[in-house]
């Protein structure tokens, strides 16, 4: 194999972050931290503009959703899927904004 380790292809149909956000949404957690729109309830204009599906999963990082600074679960899975898709050794997710 020309000195290359055999790679196992990952299931590229997976979307670990989206799956975790949907599971979290179904838990009906009431947030007491940021963002201030409180899953759309605190800002009807924003909800009308972006849609309930968007603001319903716009949440701060918490344990079930992993942490971008030190990913250990769903973000790490997503990074591994990205690396596999690109044929890279590693991939790192970044966000814009605050």
Where are these regions (language model features)?
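Conserved N-terminal alpha-helix of the aminotransferase class I/II PLP-enzyme fold
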Residues: 55-98
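N-terminal glycine-rich, Lys/His-bearing helix-loop that initiates the first secondary-structure elements
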Residues: 1-57
């Amino acid at each position: 194999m020309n000195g290359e380790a055999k790679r196992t292809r990952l299931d590229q149909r997976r979307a670990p972050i989206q799956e975790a956000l949907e599971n979290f949404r179904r838990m009906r957690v009431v947030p007491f931290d940021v963002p201030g729109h409180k899953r759309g309830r605190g800002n009807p204009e924003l909800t009308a503009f972006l849609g309930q599906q968007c603001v319903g999963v716009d949440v701060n990082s918490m344990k079930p959703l992993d942490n971008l600074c030190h990913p250990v679960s769903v973000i790490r899975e997503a990074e591994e899927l990205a690396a596999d898709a690109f044929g890279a050794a590693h991939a790192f997710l970044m966000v814009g904004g605050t």
